[in-house]
From Swiss-Prot:
Belongs to the herpesviridae UL49 family. It comes from Human herpesvirus 6A (strain Uganda-1102) (HHV-6 variant A). GO terms for cellular component: viral tegument. One of its GO terms (biological process) is viral process. This is Protein U33.
């Protein structure tokens, strides 16, 4: 079965016409940079089984490679699958095995959610003893049930199609770093005596049976996480131009300290796990009049640990990585809640992850700062997306929904925009765009610039009047 990996590299690898780390991105984000350039995109489908059009396209390319292959390759194929003639069923099986092979390569670096870590050698060993009559049935008529039965035999779990990204915290799959929670060796200082020398061996012997794990490492993780949450700036000692925690490029120098690995993962999580995105302001003519502002306007409650917006209401924001937030937890009153309020401790919790680290963030805010003795006013616009993984919307082909402030200068309500791409989102706050709520479409409210006898013009109207549009 050593020839199986060689066969997959010769026949399937030429169908992957892309750059480095594309397979890693495919398993982490569930999206391909350039559609149609990787054979694994066959498994990116919302249907029950593979997409027929994509499968037919790659099968035609694969068949051209098969016609040019050497006789030794065809002999290996006959020996492994007892098939001399190439069929579409055999191509689907080879594509699935290549999918499993690439999954095993990715799992050597990362521990991905709901994907069981298994070595490729073990996969080959299990595939060798797969019943021949089931394999022949799969080759004659490939279907999801047949492929799923083979997947259950190899991994002892269901096959998830498309490539599984249905998780509560999508981008945290990247930060489930491989084996960083393993128990460290206990360092002890002791005298060279016989009864003392047996003490470390006794600790190691009974530590394997203890369900508590490494309590010192757990406390250190809590300290690091709380510090990264409370501090605005901090330094993590990582070697120059070396991503050892994620890609161990220098194994001869030993393992990277696991607590630093966790610190790096926490730092990246705080920067990427969010459902609020800052928008570039290309035009200040939409700066809102301060006469209509309310204290509770445009405040969204964000869980600092999982990054979800917890007060989006009944709005269902569609996104490729999203899931229904309002249907996660039900209480005795059968009402949908995203926040849990404890009457005993007088503390609020996130109903999705149970964290107490809740922050309040405004999606529209006008602030004033003092820089080198000069007063500088800034206007910030933000959008709320339906997933907590901000990196998933960076693909131009992905469409998603957002909640943004109303573009009317006298309104402090929100608008739900459908099927937005990242390019449209970046050009949203510009002179030519208009996104008003239903209330503004049927009513007119005067701002400071509309009043003839207005003496004191608010800051928002001053900015809208004096700043030149781009």
């Amino acid at each position: 079965m050593f020839y199986l990996k060689k066969l997959l590299r010769q026949l399937l690898a030429p169908l992957c016409k892309h750059g480095s780390y594309t397979h890693l991105q495919l398993f982490v984000m569930g999206e391909a940079c350039v559609p149609g350039k990787c054979v694994l995109t066959m498994f990116l489908t919302n249907k029950k089984f593979l997409n027929k059009e994509v499968t037919e396209k790659f099968y035609n390319e694969f068949f051209a490679i098969w016609l040019r292959c050497r006789p030794e390759t065809r002999l290996i194929t006959k020996r492994l699958f007892n098939k001399m003639v190439m069929t579409k069923g055999l191509f689907v099986l080879l594509a699935y095995l290549y999918f499993v092979y690439r999954q095993c390569k990715v799992l050597e670096l990362l521990s991905l959610y709901k994907l069981k870590t298994i070595k490729w050698v073990d996969v080959e060993t299990r595939f060798r003893v797969y019943p021949p009559y089931k394999l022949n049935k799969l080759l004659e008529m490939p279907s999801f049930s047949e492929i799923n039965e083979l997947h259950m035999f190899l991994f002892e779990q269901q096959l998830l199609l498309p490539i599984p990204t249905h998780v509560n915290l999508p981008c945290m799959r990247l930060f489930c770093l491989r084996d960083y929670e393993q128990t460290e060796t206990v360092m002890l200082r002791y005298r060279q005596r016989e009864h003392v020398l047996s003490f470390p061996s006794m600790l190691r012997k009974y530590a394997l049976k203890s369900p508590a794990g490494n309590f010192m490492f757990t406390m250190a993780k809590a300290l690091v996480e709380n510090f990264c949450f409370s501090a605005d700036r901090y330094l993590i000692p990582v070697e120059h131009n070396n991503l050892v925690p994620m890609v161990p490029s220098k194994p001869e120098r030993g393992d990277f300290p696991k607590i630093l690995t966790f610190a790096l993962a926490t730092s990246l999580k705080d920067g990427l796990a969010t459902s609020v995105i800052s928008l570039p302001v290309m035009c200040y003519c939409k700066t809102k009049c301060s006469r209509f502002i309310l204290e509770e306007s445009y405040i969204c409650v964000i869980c600092a640990k999982c990054g979800h917006c917890l007060n989006s209401g009944k709005e269902k924001l569609c996104s490729p990585q999203g899931f229904s937030l309002s249907s996660m937890f039900y209480f005795r009153d059968k009402q949908e809640k995203n926040l849990i309020y404890s009457m005993h401790t007088d503390v609020m919790y996130c109903s999705l992850c149970g964290s107490q680290q809740l922050v309040f963030e405004r999606i529209y805010e006008m602030s004033e700062h003092c820089v080198l003795g000069m007063k500088v006013k800034t206007v910030s616009w933000k959008a709320v997306i339906g997933t907590n993984s901000a990196c998933t919307i960076l693909n131009d082909n992905v469409k998603f929904d957002v909640i943004v402030p109303c573009s009317c200068r006298s309104c402090y309500s929100t608008v739900h925009l459908y099927n937005v791409t990242v390019k449209k989102l970046l050009r949203l706050v510009s002179h030519g765009s208009d996104f008003q709520c239903q209330r503004c479409q049927h009513s007119f409210r005067e701002t400071c610039l509309d009043l003839e006898d207005c003496v004191n013009i608010c800051q928002g109207c001053q900015i809208s009047q004096n700043v030149r549009c781009i």
